[in-house]
Amino acid sequence: MSTEDEKLLKEAKKLPWDERLQHKNWKVRNDANIDLAALCDSITDPKDARLREFGPLFKKTVADSNAPVQEKALDALLAFQRAADADASRYAKEVCDAIVAKCLTGRPKTVEKAQAAFLLWVELEAAEVFLESMEKAVKNKVAKAVVPAIDVMFQALSEFGAKVVPPKKILKMLPELFDHPDQNVRASSKGLTLELCRWIGKEPVKAILFEKMRDTMKKELEAELANVSGIAKPTRKIRSEQEKELEEEVVPEAAGTNNSEEAVPEAPMEIDEYDLVDPVDILTPLEKSGFWDGVKATKWSERRDAVAELTKLASTKKIAPGDFHEICRTLKKLITDVNLAVSVEATQAIGNLAKGLRTHFSGNSRVLLPVLLEKLKEKKPTMTEALSQTLQAMHKSGCITLLDVIEDVRVAVKNKVPLVRSLTLNWVAFCIETSNKATVLKLHKEYVPICMECLNDGTPEVRDASFSVLTAIAKMVGMKPLERSLEKLDDVRKKKLSDMIGSASDTTSGTVAASNTGVGTSAREVMDSSSMRRSAASMLSGKKPVQAVPATKKSGPAKSATAKKTDGGPQSKASAAPVIEDVEPSEMSLEEIEEKLSSVVKSETISQLKSTVWKERLEAISMLKQEVESLTELDKSAELLVRLLCAVPGWSEKNVQVQQQVIEVSTYIASTVNRFPKRCVVLCLLGISERVADIKTRGHAMKCLTAFCEAVGPGFVFERLYKIMKEHKNPKVLSEGILWMVSAVEDFGISNLKLKDTIDFCKDIGLQSSAAATRNATIKLIGVLHKFVGPDIKGFLSDVKPALLSTLDAEYEKNPFEGTASAPKRTVRAADAVSSASSGTSDGLPREDISAKITPTLLKNLGSPDWKLRLESIDAVSKIVEEAHKRIQPTGTVELFTALRARLYDSNKNLVMATLSTIGGLASAMGPAVEKSSKGILADVLKCLGDNKKHMRECTLTALDLWVAAAQLDKMVPYITVTLGDQKTGSEGRKDLFDWLSKHASNMSDPSEALPLLKPSASSLMDKSSEVRKAAESFMNEILKICGQDVVAKNLKDLPSPTLAIVAERLKLSTVHEGFSDSVKMVTTSMSLPSKAGSKNNKHGPNDRGSNVSKAVSQRGIPARSSVTMISSQDSIQSQALFNIKDSNKEERERRVLVRKFKFEEPRREQIDELKIELFRHFREDVSLRLWNSDFKRQIDGIELLQKALPSSRKEVIELLDILLRWFVLRFCESNTTCLLKVLDFLPELFDVLKDQSYMLTEAEAAIFLPCLMEKSGHNIEKVREKMGELIKQMVNIYSLPKLLPYILEGLRSKNNRTRIECVDIIGYFMDHHGTEVSGLLKNLPSVAALTAERDGEIRKAALNTLATAYKNLGDDVWRYVGKLSDAQRSMLDDRFKWKAREMDKRREGRPGDARAALRRSVRENGSDIAEQSGEAVSRSMAGSMISRENFGYSDAHMVPRQMATATPGPADWREALDIVALGLPEQSVEGMKVICHELTQAVDPESSVLDDLIKEADRLVSCLAVMVPKTFNFSLSGASSRSCKYVLNTLMQTFQIKRLAHAVKEGTLDNLITELLLWLLDERVPLMDDGSQLLKALNVLMLKILDNAERTSSFVVLINLLRPLDPSRWPSPTPPESLAVKNQKFSDLVVKCLIKLTKVLQSTIYEVDLDRILQSIHIYLQELGMEEIRRRAGADDKPLRMVKTVLHELVKLRGTAIKGHLSMVPIDAEPQPIILAYIDLNLQTLAAARMLTPSGTMGQTHWGDAGSNNPNPSTHSTDAQLKQELAAVFKKIGDKQTCTIGLYELYRITQLYPKVDIFAQLQNASEAFRTYIRDGLAQVEKNAAAGRTPSSLPLSTPPPIAPIPSPKFAPSPVHTKSINNKTDCNEDDAGGDTHPFRGQGEIDNRLQTTNLQTDRYQSSGTLDALRERMKSIQAAAVGANFDGVQARPLPSMNGNTLHGGTRLDADPQTQNIIPPMDERALSGLQARMERLKSGSMEPL
């Protein structure tokens, strides 16, 4: 720079900024901009005043005409923007306009800086200004200026997101840009559109832009949109957000938390398309269209067209608001138009208006809604669909909310048309699902009652819709709002609702999980992609940018340094994610390279490499090669050496020899080093690829490329070569490069390649090349790929020209698929090379994710009622698979398979075939993963083989071929096995399946795959179709080849013998013949015996199934034996037993029977074969031969043999009853009447034997016999019918009537009219003889009444007779049970009932229904007698005896006699119901319990006064129900329904839920009830009953409710009483002696659990219980045991004893010494002493020791008061306070009439021992009457003591006056006690019922044993001396029991279930609060205080 310039610049610096920046000299302006930039960079405060000064300057500086100055001005602007804050945005408009005008056409660097400035303006919150400037920029005529403008909008949107950069303005700009003449502008606009799709979604962009776009552009964009995935996330924030984030990050950074980058990504922003479009005025064009005239036209078509015009205009996205009231009034009329088309059009118009106007349409929507809801009654699908869509649109658009339309909905759901009700509720469900949680929380209170009411609707659709609404509410806000309402639902509806809610929540959770995953991934993608600055055009496919070099340059050194550190130091096993290698080489000058290589390569060598003389260069490269080969640590210098070779001589070297040497050195380095950097490959690859094109260097270059592949993997090398070869101008580079790729694939295989990229490269570049050499090389490459990949590669090349396809096919033949056999010849050294592989599939071909294409619309259309739509959807699925090149991922296909499964059952067979083809294509495209995704659809595919159309079966087999190619045959075997055994498959289907299996059997190399198919195949050898037998035999031979004879024989041994014989014969299995058992030989013999007779008889008896089997089997080659041999041995056979039950496994046989199957089905062939085997196995041979003979006479002989043996073989007959019944069924199915009559003679005798044995048929036996008996009861011979009818009537003796009824009802559905008549008659018989209510016959009357409409007169007559019988029993009540009848039927019935009444009157039988009413009246009048009589009757009719149980173990004082039927005042219904329950009949009592439950429900109402009346009856009710518990359970166990059990438990539950009723239950009743409940809880038969698990649960819950609400004192007393061993007679069933002890133990465990529950809450309920009664019950329990038994049990760890001690311990702990005041019911002066007293004293001592309260003297002292009597000490005041409290407690006892005697006695003792103590000083505030009472009482006690009488037997004649002590200060406060006592949980172990006693309790036991307490050592305890002696003895024992140990031992802590050892006392201050406060601290009661007073340490009060 010249001196003048320097001087000028120096002078200019003195000028103001504006002058400097506008100076005429460009250097001055340039210098000023530089200074300004530096100054702005130095400013740290955004509010600096200088920034305001600089802001206006930039509008001129950035428009400088000098390019360098302009660039510096932009630098200054950027510095200013970085320093300023959002206030600077005021300058944005002028500056942006200037930049748009001058900077966008400048140098590339200038453009880049201008774009950066724009982005900073956006950051400074001037996005609107920025977009306004862009609107001007894109209108620039110069395309060069438009592209940067589009790019900067793209970058702004990409970085800041749609929230900061409004998309609306950008969308307005785009249509013009799509038609721009410049292709770069069009490409950039496409990229910007794609970015918009990422932010606001594809659909809004399509809707707004596509209509304004040319078709070609549309097509291009459609293709690009397919690549847009994921959801965008902003990567940059505006300035204010940055500042806020900085403030928020200060605290986390200080605390050392994670960076903000690791925060959870925000949810993607949702942008409404509605906000993006401009409103359109439709009112003006509507006026012009003639709408108003059209809607008034008389022609319906004109009205429709007028409304259609409105619909069309309103279909715009956003409608401008206006006055639409008149339009809506018109539409309201048109909705109800008589013409459906007009009505539909009007409805659609309303929907469009709602969508376009949104909230502006809310008022009109409210007016229209009632009409729309009313119109839902229209049944036409078009109308219904239009209404549904309109209603949904009104809600979604916000026109109406459910809160606003409650009344409209309420009216609609009461509409008389069910369709209106159901569709309204469906709409409500939709609205709730699309509302937010806050809205639903507001409205649920209104809608839940509506839904609950609709659940009782008579129409199923309405109920289902109501369930949907409740499900939607629960899904949105949880179950809590529904809980109250759900209590009113029955169990079935509750279960249905919970199932619906569960399935809905599962679906929701699955969807949420999936969506979350997607968001996470996309966010990560966005972060990765936004790290580089991109152009808009880079969004287009094929133009995606390479990794940005600037970014990698920065991170390069850091990453390499990290890598070096990692290599040097030891790596941990659980290392972090591997560091991604930087593959882009950074720039490095030759000087740097020389400097770094100075220690490795000589400087002369490098100098010579630079020489211009080729010989010197050749010599230098040779020297370099030697030096490199001599290096020992080549790894460190590898990259530098490669860089050196690339620089000198470089790849532009012209000399071939030098070139070859350079390539050789590179090859050596690549193949020698341990880790060859990918950067080196990138540096060399372009040069090497060019050398491949040269024939002189080709060999060396190819070898070098191969070495690169070994070093870094072929995937990386191929990926880099694609781009080089594609863009290179020399065609040889492409052709020869592809040829090298051929050799590379052969060497390395395909495991490291991205096959999709390779195939795309071949298809798009290689095959499209104009050079033949390139095309041929590409064909070779594809051929080699085929060798590794297989035929699947063809799917990716299907769109190639036909000529090329034929050439490719020829190449495929040269390179056949080798699969796993084609192992690679070379291996890759790099560990991370495998990561380049595209997918984890075995063939390496990529699979496409098609889940996005499986749209809800597609799935919906698959189930459309329109068959064309269904077919289109199936074809669409096939098209999706084709587009994915028949390679798909299983993601998202589960729902697709579910939808396709439904189409396999389509009524349109063509659709089924199309579905089969599609399923096959899906399986083939998905590969092995189809097995998991298809959800068992294969079973449904195989069912299509049952179709009789051959074409259908062929389609199925084709689908199976494709399936087996995808998933192995072994995965299909389970489905095929089921299909082969299914008779519905049909013979043709089974034959085709066997042929198919034979074809594919060769693929089963593993024998275990074929074994499951053996048995169904063997069974098919006996199929009636010869084609099936032939195909099965062929397949069996294939299995034989695969598995071998031994394996087949071993797996067939358990087949039925006839089948086994056939298999052995057909397959020539010698091993099977050898392995035949004797029974099989016997069967073959028996089958061959009657062959001749069978063939003769067959002409006369074609229905003899047994003979058919015998004949068929014998004809198939089973060797026959001579009948003579068999007959000659008959004498020896006769001596054998008739039955063989040794190996009978009846349970196993019954398990195979399908129970609960009431309909009769003909016996199948395999069932007959199985019966034959069982018959020969378990019956004597001669009997079996007779029974299984084709001659009916022989069969009759067999029956006679059974008849004779019946009386003596009852046990055996019962064991084999199921076999006999199956044989009888076979006889019923035959036409031989003689044999049938013989069977019918034998069966009554058999049933009589069963009845005598009290045997009841099992479910399986009934399922075998009864369906056939009912079906055949309509026999065409009258005599047979009569016998069968008698047999059915006899069945009730061995099978309960309720269980028999379903079979009879099934008979009513028979196709045989005679059967139906017989079944109706039988129902009538049972009604007449067993009553209508006993067995639930009333439920079946509707079925009988329905038969009165039959054509057949006999059926009508029978039905009328049966109903007349019902009328006789029920009277007019019968009409309640007959169901809905037509008028004609009612008239017919009415006539018959009148006739019946007349007949009854003639016979003097009274009026219909009188007997029933009389029974009820007699129940009320003398319930006890009737109860007794009916109870006896029922007990006789039941199989299980009902054992009455007695109360025991209660003293007379507390036993309450039970009076069953005493009439007490109460509601009439209640008393009548109680009388019915008292009868004791389980079935009838249900009706009574219903009434009781209803009354109890009413009683809960707080306004009701019923409860007071019911309380008087509570004890009687519970007493009756307690008696009903065993009766109902025994009744249910005898085979009846468990209904009555449920009602009893439910009634008890409702009773005990009301606390006042529970408290009114007396102790004796409670004892009986608890005993019954616990016994049934333990009964092992209960779980086996119907609903057994529910009953057990109900018993448990009921017990808990009783413990919660019953009177607690009674509960304690009852449970302690039940701890004694239970009387054996009280168990529900006879108990073996050896198990009685075990049962008692279990019973005690349950009682203990109940006591634990009561004891746990004792601290809070201590003031609710009568402690005197509880202590009395404990006393009785301990006294009954005795001291010796207590010691023995303590050693045996007896739970009941421990529990009693625990209860006592808790009571002592909670009440302290005051517990002694509750011994009024314990004879404390009895001789010997009660055991409980010793336990109380020792508990007090233990608790005091735990609290560390020790006597005032030394440990050796035996009482309290000997030490320090005259020494005043701090404890004196506390002692005074204790004495005051003790006296207060005594006075309190005296004030209570229950304890006044004991109180006076204690007070008397104090006065006798310590006469100086003035007890009346405490009574200054008491009344004179109370003081007088005490004086008189003391005198009376003194008198009694002199006479030697105990106080417990001497109650005072006068009760004490009330409230002797008004001040509460001396009495312990219950509130205070609760607050200061630490809350302790009782020890409990729920699992085993085990109780761990308190630790202190164990110490008491030990002390009692060490003290060797002998109660008889004391003299009379009636004297004070005796009491004193006893107290001293106990204290001495306590002192001798090591108090140190007591103090040191930790106190236990309870945690609810298990007792754990506690902490030391000094460690846990809370445990020290267990002992009550001062008033209850003394250790040995009154004695301690007496001693203290005596010693004079306390002054008299």
Curated annotation (Swiss-Prot):
Lipid metabolism recorded as keyword: no
HEAT repeat coordinates: 48-86, 164-202, 321-359, 362-400, 441-479, 848-886, 890-928, 931-969, 1007-1045, 1233-1259, 1260-1294, 1295-1332, 1334-1372, 1539-1579
Cross-referenced Pfam families: CLASP_N (PF12348), XMAP215_CLASP_TOG (PF21041)
Gene3D superfamilies: Leucine-rich Repeat Variant (1.25.10.10)
Comp. bias (Polar residues): 504-520, 1764-1776
Record field: compositional bias (Low complexity): 529-539
Primary localisation category: cytoplasm
Any one of the GO CC terms: kinetochore
Biological-process GO terms, alphabetical: establishment or maintenance of microtubule cytoskeleton polarity; microtubule polymerization; mitotic spindle organization
Top-level taxon in the UniProt lineage: Eukaryota
One MF term in the entry's GO annotations: microtubule plus end polymerase
Biased composition (Basic and acidic residues): 1400-1410
Subcellular location field: Cytoplasm, Cytoskeleton
Region (Disordered): 236-264, 501-576, 1087-1115, 1400-1436, 1755-1776
Keywords from the UniProt entry: Cytoplasm, Cytoskeleton, Microtubule, Repeat
Role noted for this protein: Microtubule-associated protein that is essential for cortical microtubules organization and function.
Family in the record: Belongs to the TOG/XMAP215 family.
Protein name per UniProt: Protein MOR1
Organism: Oryza sativa subsp. japonica
